[in-house]
Amino acid sequence: MSEPTTTPSIRIGTAPDSWGVWFPDDPKQVPWERFLDEVVASGYEWIELGPYGYLPTDPNQLADELGSRGLKLSAGTVFTGFHKGDDQWKRAWDQALDIAGLVSKLGAEHLVVIPDLWRSDATSEVLEARTLDDEQWAKLAAGHDRLGKALLEEFGIKQQFHSHADSHVGTTREVERFLAETDERYTNLCLDTGHFSYYGGDNLKLIDDHPSRIGYLHLKQVDTSLLFDVLKNDVPFAEAVTQDIMVEPPHGVPDLGPVIEAVAKIDSEIFAIVEQDMYGCSIDRPFPIAKRTREHIFGETAAARVS
């Protein structure tokens, strides 16, 4: 008798971002205790740290708060601007010491690294040119490889680079160049399905072309009926978020089931974190969306698992 086949699967978690949390402290945002309670009620076991300072930063307190709810931590997040020059190293490493230092004590093995935006997500002010020159690209790549190497050596943490709307690495061509100029031993991708689709990226093709560079997933969908207006009228990403550019599944692109299945075939230890950008929403809105999104994902594919 042949052995039954097992469908490869990956862990599905969520993040403060799906509750509208972008900043450590903001009166518009849901209190952190309520966030954790609603995560549990939504059926998730894995979360990201979110902005440093939103959840408790004392490792013992955070471990108690998560453990009492049966929750576990998959990653933290830092922001970098290596294309600006060597002076950016201290800023990046100071963040890493705090954030990687915290999450590693709770068993997390990943750090999601987001590049500085050329347009402010707080004020929508244009801060710098939209594209990088060759020298800036070289600084960007070298900085991330240095960071990834240091994270591995100091904390056993893997760097997962997150391309982003309104950043210098967003389009397919830009992501491909970033991969070509960085070392996969130290720098790989947190593939955010919504941000990559924001500029027309084909998530499945990227996964197929670069399976060894996919280290982490953020699951979200972009509303294409709104996207073309956003791009045509040069609407800042932060403003587009308030218009629900990142839409509740299944009302956008890409289809999440095929993405999850493709990544599960690469490595069943990869995390897929649901991350629907909702900053500025009412505090009562995220919870029902989180429940429906989880139900949608688990109804769409057998390659999703809770733990």
Locate the predicted segments by residue.
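Acidic/histidine-rich catalytic cores of soluble enzymes
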Residues: 9, 14, 46-47, 141-253, ...
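Residues at the N-termini of beta-strands
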Residues: 46, 110, 216, 270-271
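A short, acidic, amphipathic alpha-helical segment used as a generic capping/interface helix at domain edges
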Residues: 250-265
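Short acidic/histidine-rich active-site segments
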Residues: 273-279
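Acidic-and-aromatic substrate-binding clefts and catalytic sites of carbohydrate-active enzymes
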Residues: 23-27, 46-61, 81-92, 165-171, ...
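N-terminal pre-domain/capping segments
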Residues: 1-110, 134, 138, 145-146, ...
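Active-site acidic/histidine proton-transfer and metal-coordination neighborhood
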Residues: 3, 88-189, 285
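Short, flexible, mixed-charge acidic loops at enzyme active sites
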Residues: 26-31, 117-126, 226-239
